[in-house]
Amino acid sequence: MKAVLIPGDGIGKEISQSVVDITKAMNLDIEWVEYQAGAEYAAKTKEVFEPGLVDAIKEYKWALKGPTATPIGTGFRSVNVALRQKFATYANVRPIRSFKGIDSKYENISHDSWKYRRSL
């Protein structure tokens, strides 16, 4: 299986490589196809992300994106916003679960609970 890997900026490169190493250690059949995006890439090219990235995500159906920086006050809109607009994905969906031994306002929340937030 092929999947797009977008390492991103700063620590993104490090943690993305860790994910690649983990998938290899687990003998998962993933061929990572790397594309660049983020502030570091934009500083070199004046583009938010590498040409072909959107087409690769459409083709492979899977992508892992590391953290990306966004210049404040100047430059481009965030990589997250650009990708959300390209793919019309505006929902931020998060699973919610309670853990035994951890006090919280709500107890016994199963993994079947979800938080939905609109992302623009």
Regions found by a protein language model. Name each.
Residues M1-Q36:
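N-terminal phosphate-binding or glycine-rich loops at protein starts, especially the Walker A/P-loop
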